[in-house]
Amino acid sequence: MSPLPLRDPSHQANAGPRLVEPSCGPGVSLSNRTLCHPSWPMYDNWGRSPTTSERPEEEQVVSKDTGVPVRNYEDVFLLDPLLPCGQRVPLILTKPPQQAMDSRKLLLPPPIMSPSVHPSSSQACSSTWLSEAEMIALAGLLQMSQGEQTPNCVASSLPSTSCPDPVSVSEDPGPSGDQSCSGTDT
């Protein structure tokens, strides 16, 4: 057996640019990001205007404005690369297939999740503010669940009605080690 030559002397380089037609053969794609769908050949054939010799007599002439010829619901599907080969994900259409297609573009059903906020009709959630005692209790529970300070520090760290001005709070700790208001006795 003789080794093959590295360069075929009869091969001539193509002088001009080559146009690549869209093809859906196995492993062929328009770019590295274009996936081929098994229904594309049907759409490509529909997009080309057939001559009278190629068209059977019993087939009706369909205008391009009527949509892509989808015969039944099984013709509209999606492929999932994680599923076994050949398994399809059916696309549930709300309209008959002939009405769901428009100018070679599949009209998908409306999304399940809406971008608009639906107002709540229940009155269970009120927008009233918590009282000071409720805030202290809630802050204490949160800090206890995180294993932080004692509840005495929680009460002094929150602004209270007896010490409304944060400037009047002294920086040196009181007898119990907590901060105290300058105008109050501890």
Swiss-Prot record:
GO CC, alphabetical: cytoplasm; nucleus
Tissues expressing this chain: Widely expressed.
Highest taxon above the source species: Eukaryota
Key words of the record: Cytoplasm, Nucleus, Repressor, Transcription, Transcription regulation
Record localization: Nucleus; Cytoplasm
Biased composition annotated in UniProt, kind: Polar residues: 148-163, 177-186
Any one GO BP annotation for this protein: negative regulation of DNA-templated transcription
Pfam short name (any one): SAP25
Location of the region described as Disordered in the Swiss-Prot/TrEMBL record: 1-25, 148-186
Protein's job: Involved in the transcriptional repression mediated by the mSIN3A but not the N-CoR corepressor complex.
Record's subunit section: May be a component of the mSIN3A corepressor complex. Interacts with SIN3A and HDAC2.
UniProt protein name: Histone deacetylase complex subunit SAP25
Species name: Mus musculus (Mouse)
